[in-house]
Every structure is written in C-alpha cells, then in structure tokens.
C-alpha cells in the first residue's frame, strides 16, 4: 500500500465522502474524451514546459475526431466544449497571462497525468525495465546502508536514511507493484484472445493459442528469475540496516519504515511465482479443452484433412510415414475379483463365480445412491472428504478400485464451477497410505 493510501486510510470515511461531495468531484470520460486526453498528454510530453496553447488542443481534437467520424465534425465549437469538459473535471488546468496576450495555456492536472500515465507509460512490462528498476532500488539501498553505518544525529538519520528509504526505495517499489498489476491485466488480455480464437475456429487456432501460451509462460519465468535474484540482495540490505538500528528507541521510525519495505518486497517477489502457478493452471485448462474438442471431433477433422491432402497431392506432394510397433500387453485382467487379502477361509458359493464387472456394477449402484443424497439436498461433493470417509470403511486393498468408482460416479452427477475458472485444486490425502486426490468441489448438478 502506498503512503498516499495509508494517509487516506487514516481519515474517517465520512470525512472523505464529505470532501468529495463538497468539491463536486466527478469523472465522465467517454472513449472519444479519453482519446483526446491521451492525445493532449502525448503532445505535452513533446514540449519542454509541458504547456499547450488552445490552438494545439484544437489540432489534437481534430486528429482524434478523424477516427471518431460517427460523433460529428471537428468544429471549433465541439473542440471548445471538449476542452471545457476536461477543465470542469479538473483533468486540465487553464491559465491566462499578459505574456500570452490573453490567450489561454493548458497543463495536465495530477489526476490526468495519473490516468494517461496508466494508458501510455505502463503498457509494456519487460524484463529490461524490471531490471533497471531493481538496480535503482539496490543503488538507493546501498546509499542508505552507507549513511546508516556512518551514524550521526537524528537529523542525519532522517535526511540520509529515512528519506532515502521512504521516498526513493518506497516509490520504486510502488512503481514495480503497479507494473506487476499491469502485467496481470495483460494476462487477462491474452486469455481473452485465446477464448476468442477457440470460439471462432479451434482447429485453426491451436497453433496461435500455443504461441500465446508459450510466450506468456516464458515472459513470466524470465521475470520471476529476475525478481528472485534481485530479491535476495534487497532482503540482505534490509536486514543489514535493521541490525544497525535494532534496540535504539530513537530510531524506531527507521524500523517502521523497514517493516513497510519488507512487506512490499515480499509482495513483489511472491507475485512472480503466484503468477506462474496460476498461468500453469490456465495452460492445463486450455490444453484439456483442446484435447476434449479433438476427441469429440477427431473423425471429422482427420477425414477432412486426409481428403484435402489427397486432393492437393499433385500440387503439394507429401510422404506418408508410419510405425508398426508391437502392442503393449495389458497386465490387468478385467475378470479378476476384487482382492481381499484380509479375509481368509472358504468363499461362499453364491459369490464364488461372480466376475469383476458384476461386482463393479453393484458397487457403482451403491456408491451412486450415496452420492445422490448430496444432489437431492443441494450439497456440494468434496471428493477429498467423501473418498476419505468412504475408504475408511473398507480394506486398503480395495481402495484403488473403490476410489475410481466413486470418482466416476461423482463426475456423472455434475461438475465444478472452478473448472471453468481455471482454478487449480490442492492435493488432498484420502487414506493413511499416501493416496491423494486433486479435484475441485462439485457444486453444479
């Protein structure tokens, strides 16, 4: 949390609400108005004094209006209305002086800079940019450590240590945090692109989806490696300063600042691994969807490709390569009776000749009745809990077969909403012999 947010949080909410109401703050930016504001920001950055005249604002409005033909012509009247709207919303400030012979000059307000900065300057989050920011932080931390080792008066600590930590290091940490949030949005954008591709034509979209997934995965891994390497160094620097001020009550404000920096550093470094874990889950979800689509449509797609290949053979000749390998032997006999090594003695005549399939059907029916109670009562099915309770009632030698039947019956009952959100479930132990299951709670029937 930035210092500005901390200061705001210290004020009662009703006072802040009254302040907003008293000053009549409001924002209403249509797409055209936002484009106009961004155009003003771009032009301002090209000026040394970052000031624009009214004529330059009219020129910017004309450029924007060309791309928004449906809104009307770029008349001076409409341009003045747009400028006045931005002034009223405190997005640009208007000044008039004798030096400009009565003509107005305009500057972006801090609010406008924040808005345009988000859209213009924070759209690219690369490894190079992150490396530069982390190098700057390390340099500022080195200055603070050097000043702390020298020691001195309270004024020395406030000026050369506290100020560097709070305003230099803290601000760069906030900037990195903001860039990471932009990267989160970019991931959402990539997910939307993949969804659009799969909805249009998943057969043609497979290669594009794979490219988008791999590119994002590689970017996240590079960023995480950079964060991990720099994070260890920054952690050491924070601990060095903490050791120098430990136990000194007069320097307690330094310890509080270091505590805040430690929280920011932990959040920044943990972001990378969390982003990778979430993306891996989404990657698996997409591949599972594609495999399912291929299984459902494999005959049509393969036959279509084969016919097309034969048709185009003379224009684009091809070679057919095939492999003829021996089939693998299935060592599991489907006619085996469920094992029960814990039972000794003579098998009753009525079950002596029962085959596995018959036993399986009876078990499936009983398990289905057990799970149907969840469906009738509208309760979710947590397979981890259900399996653990059910398997505890049976010998360990039956656990594998029984767990498979329970899961098979459960997925027929319904599905989990979390599967469609690419949420990766945790592994849960289901018996005392190390068996685990990974499944989301079934909450839709």
Swiss-Prot record:
Gene3D superfamilies named in the record: Chromosome partition protein MukF, middle domain, MukF, C-terminal domain, Winged helix-like DNA-binding domain superfamily/Winged helix DNA-binding domain
Q: Where are the transmembrane segments?
A: none
Kindly list the places in or outside the cell where this protein is found, as annotated in its UniProt entry: Cytoplasm, Nucleoid
Q: Which InterPro entries match?
A: Chromosome_partition_MukF, MukF_C, MukF_C_sf, MukF_M, MukF_M_sp, MukF_WHTH, WH-like_DNA-bd_sf, WH_DNA-bd_sf
Please tell me whether the keyword Cell membrane is annotated for this protein. no
Q: Carries keyword Ribonucleoprotein?
A: no
- Give the Gene Ontology MF terms in alphabetical order: calcium ion binding
What keywords were assigned to this record? Calcium, Cell cycle, Cell division, Chromosome partition, Cytoplasm, DNA condensation
Any one GO biological process:
chromosome condensation
Any Gene Ontology CC annotation: nucleoid
Stretches for region Leucine-zipper = 213-241
User: What family, per the record?
Assistant: Belongs to the MukF family.
Query: What does this protein do, in the record's words?
Result: Involved in chromosome condensation, segregation and cell cycle progression. May participate in facilitating chromosome segregation by condensation DNA from both sides of a centrally located replisome during cell division. Not required for mini-F plasmid partitioning. Probably acts via its interaction with MukB and MukE. Overexpression results in anucleate cells. It has a calcium binding activity.
What HAMAP family does its record include?
A: MukF
Q: How does it assemble?
A: Interacts, and probably forms a ternary complex, with MukE and MukB via its C-terminal region. The complex formation is stimulated by calcium or magnesium. It is required for an interaction between MukE and MukB.
Protein name as annotated:
Chromosome partition protein MukF
């Amino acid at each position: 949390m930035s210092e500005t947010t901390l200061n705001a949080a210290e004020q009662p909410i009703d006072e802040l609400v009254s302040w907003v109401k008293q000053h009549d703050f409001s924002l209403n930016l249509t797409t055209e108005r936002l484009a106009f504001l961004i155009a003003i920001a771009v032009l301002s950055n090209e000026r040394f004094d970052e000031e624009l005249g009214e004529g330059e604002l009219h020129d910017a409005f004309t450029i924007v209006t060309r791309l928004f033909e449906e809104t009307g012509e770029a008349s001076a009247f409409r341009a003045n209305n747009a400028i006045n709207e931005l002034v009223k919303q405190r997005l640009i400030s208007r000044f008039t002086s004798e030096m400009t012979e009565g003509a107005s000059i305009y500057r972006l307000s801090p609010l406008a800079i924040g808005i345009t900065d988000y859209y213009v300057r924070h759209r690219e989050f690369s490894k190079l940019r992150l490396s530069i920011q982390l190098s700057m932080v390390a340099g500022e931390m080195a200055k603070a450590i050097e000043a702390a080792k020298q020691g001195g008066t309270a004024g020395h600590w406030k000026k050369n240590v506290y100020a560097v930590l709070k305003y230099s290091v803290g601000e760069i940490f906030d900037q990195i945090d903001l860039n990471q949030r932009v990267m989160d949005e970019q991931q959402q954008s990539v997910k939307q692109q993949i969804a659009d591709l799969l909805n249009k034509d998943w057969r043609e979209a497979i290669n594009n989806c794979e490219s988008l997934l791999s590119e994002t995965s590689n970017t996240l891994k590079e960023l995480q490696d950079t964060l991990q390497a720099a994070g260890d160094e920054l952690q050491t620097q924070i601990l060095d300063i903490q050791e120098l001020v430990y136990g000194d009550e007069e320097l307690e404000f330094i310890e509080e600042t270091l505590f805040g920096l430690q929280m920011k550093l932990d959040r920044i470094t943990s972001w990378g691994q969390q982003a990778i874990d979430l993306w891996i889950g989404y990657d698996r979800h997409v591949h599972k969807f594609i495999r399912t689509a291929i299984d459902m449509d494999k005959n049509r797609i393969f036959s279509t490709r084969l016919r097309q290949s034969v048709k185009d053979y003379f224009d684009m000749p091809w070679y057919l390569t095939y492999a003829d390998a021996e089939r693998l032997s299935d060592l599991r006999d489907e006619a085996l009776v469920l094992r029960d090594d814990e039972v000794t003695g003579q098998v009753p005549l009525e079950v002596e000749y029962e085959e596995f399939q018959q036993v399986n059907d009876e078990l499936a029916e009983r398990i289905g009745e057990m799970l149907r109670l969840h469906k009738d009562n509208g309760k979710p099915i947590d397979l981890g809990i259900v399996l653990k309770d059910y398997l505890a009632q049976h010998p360990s030698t039956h656990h594998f077969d029984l767990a498979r039947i329970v899961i098979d019956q459960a997925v027929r009952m319904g599905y989990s909403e979390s599967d469609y959100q690419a949420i990766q479930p945790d592994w849960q132990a289901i018996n005392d012999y190390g068996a685990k299951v990974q499944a989301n709670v079934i909450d839709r029937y």
